[in-house]
Swiss-Prot record:
Keyword presence, Transferase: no
Protein name, as recorded: Cilia- and flagella-associated protein 251
Main location, first listed in the record: cytoplasm
WD repeats: 484-526, 534-574, 585-624, 643-678, 681-741, 745-785, 791-828, 838-874, 881-924, 935-975, 981-1027, 1033-1071, 1109-1149, 1169-1209
Organism phylogeny: Eukaryota, Metazoa, Chordata, Craniata, Vertebrata
Gene source species: Mus musculus
One Pfam assignment: WD40
Biased composition (Basic and acidic residues): 190-199, 229-257, 281-297, 331-351
């Protein structure tokens, strides 16, 4: 054998000798420890014997006490018997004889019981001695087994396995790990001994308790055999004995507690001795090893056991960064001791028992120490697959986003992962992580406004998004988990939000440019979790609107931005807090050539230069001049840029400029993508794919592998003709199309095509999971919303923008209205024309389209207030659509167009609702070619205008039309008489309801529980029917911050869809009715939810005043001056209702008062046939809350009236002349008589103390004398009318008026 083969054996022999010496030392130490253990056990046994003797003495004392108490009881019984039997001597003698006999029996029984107890005690002692002997034998056996294990032969294979394990796990050396293992085994043995002692003590206490219970049961059985009188006496004695025994048991428990405390102290002493021993051994081993261990391994203290472990490696590339580490600094520890726990279950049991003996504070400290060591941040341990492995959130929200159709093509798309082709883009106020392979989306929700800019880190770990609008936010997300790790509030105090955002290559800093008139450049140290920027710079307006910002990849203190006319270079001096900038003016005279408008700017890969692309296909090269160390002038103290040259690259406008690896990449308006080297020489290009104008390019983070024989890479344009190697990339175009380019093989894959213009139209199929989306760009796209699969589409010719869509009840046809007035009837499955030619009878955009229930009629409405009707006729045996008639029936925009059914004839009925407050029904039977007949016209409101109309579901016997208005009210109108039957407070979420639909039901069992889905300006919400004004029956969520354009519901009622208009997206919302019902139940029953709508609640001042006015109205109705007995009831007559309303600050018009009367009078008419002429206080409160203005009386309402009726005076305010003011009161609207007007003013000015004619029993011989020419000023403004005439005050905190 060679030397190389002998070396391992020699090394193993030497190591074996070293181990034998160590084992001998260990045996000596173990023998010394065993001797100490034996001494301690002997001392404990002596203590146990002394304690047993003391217990026997105490038991004897207790028995003597019992006998004395029994004798006392007997004496008391004798005395009682003597007192009771003074007149009966014969009976006493007989009773004494019987008592003597019974006493003899009792003594005999007690002697027998004492004998039995002594025998049982002797048996128990014998059993304890036997158990001790068995335990000693077991301990001897264990010691012998340990000695045999130590004497086992040396196993070199085991040494090699342990060495490999220590190297792979990065833990201690093999010898040290063995020492730690032996220390743990010794600790386990001690813990087992402690457990055995505890178990013995518990068994002894159980035996004692059983003996006491058996004796107690025997005493009870003896008492039952005695006579009735003796039983009574014995029961009293038994109770006293029970009390004494309970006291004895308590004393026993206290003694056991003392014993446990002593055991705990002994355990603590042993642990301290062990710690001292370990410290001595560690000092012998040397402090150098300890320092290395502390650096490499972290320790977790669990029940005084030191377990070393390797800290987990963070998947982030920023784990070593001190700034980023602060984000998850406290959560990056984890004790991976699962293997030790599985190998030593006895340790865990002992640990649990030790914890049970600890005090409350000690347990709390121990729990905290374990929690800190075991916790790990999800951010620190997550991987790239974590995000899409998340389970769906529990159903805690009534509406939750499940899918987003569309893409904001004005913002870039980022390539996040190549293996699953995960891309990042934005829709409205949501950032979306889309897994192309799995066809799944993850939504990053949190912005209140439309996302205006976003960026990602070099390693694709961190995502930064910012929005524009009020309360704008900057949010940094972890792409592995979808968690927002940091949010910057109030980033733009001006409220305009951010225009551009960038992140450094090392992800430590963020830079933003605001979207305000005076732009600000801010640099943020986001990893430090601060809310203020590290540096801020205001840009002059002459620099233009900067909308592109980039960091220098080689230097995170340098930035460049550009507007269409100006490029700016920035240099950040972090220590000085200065952001220096250089913005040289560039004109056509600079190079004597046309430069063009700038598009994007980047830093050069190798040279200190900045490159700016222009819309003329040129590239401006700027040199960066750094100050020399010898320069002393203030001007040259900071770096600056100078234009060096103008390079004409191509004719087409350059829209994208970026760098990747060693290439400079451009994308242009013709769809060409070109690659240049650092000398601006062309290396390769893609121009034969006929793409749209390039909006964004994003390359994979995966570095391309070296080419092989199987590679199908293109050759570059150099003379050598090398293979062109570049990362795969994502292409986004201005026409909202996203592609994936695989360089190996030059494979272009279209990922999706979305509408590039506003989306206003959306409609769901009546019985299939299909949704049709229409865009102003002329595209109609049909999706399967359950499988999230695009099915088919049609793009119409240029100039035809889709404005509205609707399926017919059978789902076979799709009606479409276009922006230029054309109406198409399409086949629902192919989107081909159903009629030979489209209908062109309108010159303006078609806003509404609907079919009748039998699909024989279709009606449309346009923005010129015109309603058109189309019908089916039979020609040559075929059903053909023809135009019937059209009518300009409204004076303002049409809000709703609705088909219904005549209940008596089952014929369709058509209604339209306009912003002019008119509800018009058309007579389709009498209509003919070019003549649309009107059946009736009704005005729906007096001041507010209607916003939408639907059929109310048949929850009652009466058929209603539900109409929402701009005053946040929901009104129910009788479908036949058009009478307003009820006015209710609708959802108030910042803006009134604009569109509503009743949620479809899946079965007939759900017909009695219906729901309403609605949208307002920017939200989608749910409302439980019937509407009653309860604020807990409704909820809403922001769906499109820039405005909702349309809504549709799935056929099964599980999903709602909202179209975002200008944000070019449609969002799918999952409906969870259980969450809404839970909120209602938590809100309370009966009047509890309504009390919350009153200032101060039920116990507040307002409600108390309401009660006073309510009962005072009873006094008024009976006469103020009457001397008859008052009759107080729970109701007031309806005639008193207006006066109470005005008394509490609500001033309804006469029409609103009439609506209130109708609502109350006919509330039970359908069920009982009777009219109601009175109202109680709870119902009055509901009527008041539902009819009053939702936000009270405001100064804005009065000011708007003066803006319409008044003129501008010399001070620039709107005012009304006195004569005009009085004339308006007498002639316009619900005009007054002259007498009514004078009485009103006399009341307002305090000339009628009784309050005008509101007091029916008050007498007034002569009418009030008032001269309005003197009381009223010549010119009345809104402020004068409010404060001086009405006597109202304006709240300081709001514009609400206070009476």
């Amino acid at each position: 054998m060679s030397d190389t083969e002998e070396n391992p054996l020699e090394e193993s022999r030497e190591s074996g000798e070293m181990e034998e010496e160590k084992e001998e030392k260990k045996e000596e130490e173990e023998e010394e420890e065993e001797g100490e253990k034996e001494k301690e056990e002997e001392e404990e046994e002596e203590k146990g014997k002394e304690e047993e003797k003391e217990e026997e003495k105490e038991e004897g004392k207790e028995e003597e006490k019992k006998e004395e108490e029994e004798e006392k009881g007997k004496k008391e019984e004798e005395e009682e018997e003597e007192e009771e039997g003074k007149g009966k001597e014969e009976e006493k003698e007989e009773e004494k004889e019987e008592e003597e006999k019974e006493e003899e029996k009792e003594k005999e029984e007690e002697e027998e019981e004492e004998g039995k107890g002594k025998e049982e005690e002797e048996e128990g002692k014998e059993e304890e001695e036997e158990e001790k002997e068995e335990e000693e034998k077991e301990e001897e056996k264990e010691e012998e087994e340990e000695e045999e294990e130590e004497k086992e032969e040396y196993n070199p294979s085991f040494e090699e396995d342990a060495l490999q394990q220590s190297l792979t796990e990065g833990s201690l050396s093999w010898e040290e790990s063995q020492e730690d293992g032996e220390g743990l085994e010794e600790w386990v043995e001690k813990e087992e001994q402690r457990e055995g002692e505890e178990v013995r003590g518990e068994e002894e206490s159980e035996v004692r308790g059983r003996e006491e219970e058996e004796g107690w049961e025997e005493e009870k059985s003896g008492e039952e055999e005695k006579s009735e009188e003796s039983e009574r006496s014995k029961e009293r004695g038994g109770e006293e004995e029970g009390q004494e025994k309970e006291e004895a048991e308590h004393e026993g428990e206290r003694e056991e507690g003392r014993e446990e405390e002593e055991k705990e102290k002994s355990v603590e002493r042993e642990e301290e001795e062990e710690e001292e021993d370990t410290e001595t051994t560690e000092t012998k081993a040397g402090r150098a090893k300890e320092e290395k261990k502390e650096k490499q391994n972290k320790t977790a203290l669990v029940d005084n056991i030191v377990i070393s472990h390797e800290p987990p490696r963070s998947s982030s590339s920023l784990a070593d960064s001190p700034e980023v580490s602060q984000i998850y600094k406290d959560n990056s520890m984890k004790v991976d001791d699962t293997e030790e726990a599985s190998q030593k279950p006895e340790d865990i049991l002992a640990q649990g028992k030790d914890e049970a003996r600890l005090s409350l504070e000690e347990r709390r400290k121990l729990f905290q120490s374990k929690g800190l060591s075991a916790e790990e941040s999800l951010v620190s341990v997550s991987t790239e697959d974590t995000l899409f492995q998340k389970e769906e959130d529990s159903k805690v929200y009534p509406l939750s986003m499940t899918w987003s159709f569309g893409w904001n093509s004005s913002l870039p798309v980022y390539y996040m992962r190549e293996d699953r082709r995960v891309i990042l883009y934005t829709c409205a106020h949501t950032a979306i992580m889309y897994d192309v392979v799995r066809n799944t989306q993850y939504h990053l929700q949190g912005h209140p406004n439309i996302i205006s800019c976003l960026c990602v880190s070099e390693d694709r770990r961190w995502i930064a998004t910012a929005d524009e609008g009020p309360d704008c936010l900057i949010i940094i997300w972890d792409s592995f988990t979808g968690i927002p790790v940091h949010t910057i509030f109030d980033s733009c105090p001006e409220g305009n939000g951010m225009r551009s955002i960038a992140i450094t290559r090392d992800s430590k800093f963020l830079a933003t440019i605001s979207d305000s008139a005076t732009q600000k450049v801010c640099i943020w140290k986001w990893t430090l979790a601060v809310e203020t920027p590290a540096c801020t710079l205001e840009l002059p307006k002459e620099y233009g609107f900067q909308d592109n910002l980039v960091f220098n990849p080689a230097n995170n203190k340098e930035l460049v931005s550009n507007s269409k006319t100006q490029a700016i270079y920035y240099c950040w001096f972090e220590d000085k807090g200065i952001l220096a900038h250089s913005a040289p003016v560039l004109t056509e005279k600079t190079f004597n050539k046309l430069v063009g408008k700038f598009s994007q700017s980047v830093f050069h890969l190798k040279l200190p230069q900045v490159l700016s692309a222009t819309k003329e296909g040129k590239l401006v090269v700027w040199d960066i001049h750094y100050p020399s160390s010898t320069s002393s002038s203030a001007i040259s103290a900071f770096p600056f840029i100078k234009p060096r040259k103008l390079v004409h690259l191509q004719k087409e406008a350059i829209t994208v400029l970026m760098t990747i690896d060693s290439y400079i990449v451009t994308g242009d308006i013709k769809g060409n993508i070109k690659f240049y080297d650092h000398t601006l020489s062309v290396v390769n290009w893609y121009s034969n794919f006929k793409l749209g104008a390039i909006r964004t390019l994003s390359f994979s983070k995966t570095i391309p592998s070296l080419p092989t024989e199987k590679s199908n890479l293109p050759t570059d344009c150099t003379l050598r003709g090398d293979l062109f190697v570049v990362r795969n990339f994502i292409i986004g175009t201005f026409d909202a199309t996203v592609y994936h380019m695989t360089v190996d093989g030059t494979k272009l894959e279209k990922l999706f095509v979305e509408p590039r213009d506003a989306v206003y139209a959306v409609s769901c199929h009546p019985y299939q999971p299909l949704i049709a989306v229409g865009s102003v760009c002329g595209m109609i796209k049909v999706w399967d919303f359950e499988k999230k699969v695009y099915l088919f589409s049609r793009t119409f010719e240029k100039g035809l923008g889709v404005q509205c869509l609707t399926y017919n009840p059978e789902g076979a046809l799709l009606g479409a209205g276009f922006t230029e007035g054309t109406v198409y009837i399409l086949d629902a499955m192919s989107l081909e024309n159903e009629s030979p030619e489209p209908f062109k009878y309108s010159k303006s955009s078609v806003s509404h389209c609907c079919f009748s229930h039998d699909s024989n009629y279709m009606a449309t409405a346009d923005v010129n207030f015109t309603v058109a009707v189309y019908m089916v006729v039979v020609k040559n045996g075929q059903r053909v659509w023809e135009y019937l008639a059209r009518l300009r029936s409204h004076q303002n925009s049409i809000q709703s167009l609705l088909f219904g059914v005549h209940l008596d004839s089952n014929e369709p009925r058509l209604l339209s609702l306009g912003k002019d407050r008119f509800l018009i029904e058309y007579n389709l039977v009498k209509s003919c070619k070019d003549h649309l007949d009107v059946l009736d016209v009704h005005r729906t409101d007096q001041g507010n205008y209607p916003t939408c109309m639907i059929w109310y579901p048949p929850l009652t016997k009466e058929l209603f039309l539900l109409i929402c208005n701009s005053g946040y009210k929901v009104k129910l109108f009788n479908a036949t008489t058009k009478m307003c039957r009820k006015t209710l407070l609708g959802p108030a979420y910042g803006s009134p309801i604009e569109h509503a639909q009743v949620l479809p039901v899946k079965s007939t069992l759900e017909l009695q529980k219906r729901y309403l889905v609605f949208i307002n300006k920017d939200k989608v919400g749910l409302q439980i029917l019937p509407v009653d004004g309860n604020p807990h029956k409704t909820c809403a969520i922001v769906c499109h911050p820039n405005g909702v354009a349309g809504m549709a519901l799935s056929y099964d009622g599980r999903f709602a869809f909202t179209a975002g208009g200008q944000d070019r997206s449609v969002v799918q919302w999952k409906i969870n009715l259980g969450a809404l019902e839970a909120a209602v139940s938590l809100g309370g029953e009966d009047l509890t939810p309504f009390y919350g709508l009153v200032s101060g609640g039920r116990e507040g001042k307002f409600y108390r005043e309401l009660e006073d006015y309510f009962y005072y109205s009873q006094i008024r109705s009976q006469g103020i001056d009457t001397m008859e007995t008052r009759q107080v009831s729970e109701h007031i007559c309806l005639s008193e209702l207006p006066f109470v309303m005005r008394a509490i600050g609500f001033y309804p018009s006469e029409e609103k008062i009439e609506d209130m009367f109708n609502e109350i009078k006919f509330s039970e008419y359908v069920e009982t046939g009777k009219l109601i002429d009175k109202i109680n206080l709870p119902d009055f409160l509901k009527v008041y809350l539902n009819h009053r203005p939702p936000f009270g009386n405001t100064m804005d309402g009065i000011q708007n009236s003066f803006n319409v009726l008044g003129y501008t005076n010399s001070e620039g305010k709107k005012a009304i002349r006195r004569e005009d003011f009085l004339n308006l009161l007498l002639t316009k609207g619900e005009h007054m008589t002259e007498e009514e007007m004078i009485d009103c003013f006399s009341t307002l000015f305090g000339l009628t103390p009784e309050g005008w004619k509101s007091e029916p029993a008050a007498t007034c011989i002569n009418g009030p004398e008032i001269c309005l020419q003197k009381e009223l000023p010549e010119e009345i403004t809104a402020e004068i009318f409010t404060t001086e005439i009405l006597g109202l005050t304006l709240s300081d905190s709001s514009e609400q008026l206070i009476q």
